[in-house]
Amino acid sequence: MKGSKFSVLIAGLVLAVTVLAASLALAQSGMVAAAHPLAIQEGEKVLLNGGNAIEAAIVTAAVLGVVEPYASGIGGGGFMVVHIPQAGDQLAQRFVIDSRVTAPQDATPDMFRGLTLDQIDTGGLAVGVPGALKHWDEALKISRELQLSGRLQGLNMTLSQALQPAIEIARNGFDVSDTFIRILNTHRNRLAKFPDSAALFFDLPTDPAACAPEAPPLPACHLTQPALADTLELVAAQGTDVFYRGPIADAIVDTVRHPKTDDPNILSGRMRKDDGVDDLALYDIKRRDPVTGTYKGFTLVTAGPPAGGVTLIELLNIVDDQRFPFGTAGFRFLELDTVHVMIEAMKLSYADKRAFIGDPDFALVPPPGDPDRPPIPITGLTSPAYAAERRSLIDLATSLPVEQDPGNPYCFETPPPPSACPSTSLSQASKGVDEEVVTLEEESSTTHFSAIDSFGNMVAYTTSLSSLFGSAMVVTCEIATCAVEGRRVGGFLLNNSLNGFSRGTSPGVRYNAPEGGKRPRSDMSPTLVFSPSGTPRLVVGAAGGGRIPAIVFQIISDVIDHGKSIQQAISAPRFVNENLAQSATTIGHHNTRHETPPFNLSQTLVTELRARGQTVIRNTVTFGAAQGIAIDPDTGALSRGTDPRRGGDF
């Protein structure tokens, strides 16, 4: 029977062999690390056929949007860090593509105030203008231009070509996993508010065991997405304008402004497409310089504001000191002093994140209510000297209280702004008092993947809908202008990424209040790591919302300080402290959180941490989903790490 579990089981065996064969051919072709074997397979096909890491990354991204529709796709956006190595007299190139969603032009600083978390996260209000398709198109244009100039090798791949594997999988379907069903079950109540969302997903079983790899064949575990296939085919045929200006744009705006639900608590969004404002048509990606830092002689290249790379660099800077000799006696892997210091660094760096990180383009001009506000202090936040000042607050004998105040990185800018120095602390009006729209989402609400090709080009790409299943709304077409040749476009989930904005009333919310056209702050931290000699060492990143910088921090330290393989580092227990006070929207986040078995910290370690004053609780589920590639410093051999928390380690 077409699409039967038996036929898919055979296909799965072939897929496993294909992925293994690709792994054995790594020295010739490169590698992809992603959260789903189909995405790895299609990305590595590109590499095996002579494609470059950028081309493989876009194919991988498109497939992930089909097989992980709850985590990413054309309804969201993200950040890609690219490295093109030196060739002859041509210097290495490194850049970031920023496709973070933007707020509609009608967004206002008070748009989320007084609302419940569910009103913000579910429905139209937190839907931002998605950037994924423009990102993919622009990345492939850059790749083709570099190939034309002789700077890059590859397949001269177009967006239409890159979308074909995703179209085929959406049309023919794939077998969902037990992980997919578990994630779906946590969001059934949200999805049930929208008949079109329920229709797409609710024919799947409710028992995760029914779709586990070892379960008997079950056709009900097979998911097809014909509307998404039609939409991707239309984009492949007509280009991104059909999404940002044409019938797909009409369908998006109609879905956002008129949510298809009977629930009176669901709010409409502010996205427009009319004579006055056309939010989708105004969207554009940003090509930015990466931010860089060092750790133990290694160089980090990552995505700066509005992404989370600055927080990651600050975390590593804080612990990079002779007081904390990670990897030696007393500071070994998951020992008390090691974990204690890392928790304290998280409190300090996360306080700074909420005070100073936002959309850098909007930070260039002070708002009327804050005329003395300087630009985002990126140099200060990533300065080792500033980290030393923050580090001085850490005591090995006891823990810092939660709700740590931010420091004053302005004084470490070059030159520092006169209004910020020589004061050594920020005034109350400048502190990051921040009623951030923090979801209670405990699972992976994003996806990350890494790619490296045989030419040495590397890509780290994190992309997101924000919460799992984003806004919970599937785009549908119920107006005449969004029908094309008798087919109605849609079939994909929209983000709720505007929940990344702050909604505090304090003047301290200086950089991250909602504004029209603005990108909300993000914690996505796709990262490249280079050895002291300059050779590539890691391509890594993670899903996990606000926990992402802390997760990537732990993985990098586990590899560099403790000699772990990339798979061991990704599979290791995790902990995070986001320096948030207990409140109606952040219950529990003021604690240091760790995971359930088999990823949990030992009870002995938890007891020791509590004796130092740390409040430690165990999450009800795991958090984060990291993917990475390690390059052996001696042989150049590649190894892949995939996260078992979301079905990885295959």
Question: What residue spans do the PLM features occupy?
Answer:
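Bacterial N-terminal signal peptides that target proteins for export
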Residues: M1-L13
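Bacterial N-terminal signal peptides
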Residues: I10-A22
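Noncatalytic scaffold domains of N-terminal-nucleophile
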Residues: A27-Q41, K45, A53-Q238, F243-R245, ...
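Alpha-helical support elements that line or immediately flank enzyme active sites
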Residues: V46-L47, K134-I142, Q238-R245, D250, ...
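Active-site rim segments in enzyme catalytic domains, especially the processed small/beta chain
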Residues: V66-D89, Q93-F95, D262-G276, S430, ...
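Internal maturation/activation junctions in enzymes
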Residues: P205, K273, P325-S464, N619-T620
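Active-site Gly/Thr loop motif
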Residues: G269-K296, R391-L440, R488-M524, L528
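Extended C-terminal subregions enriched in glycine
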Residues: F455, L498, G517-P520, V552-F553, ...
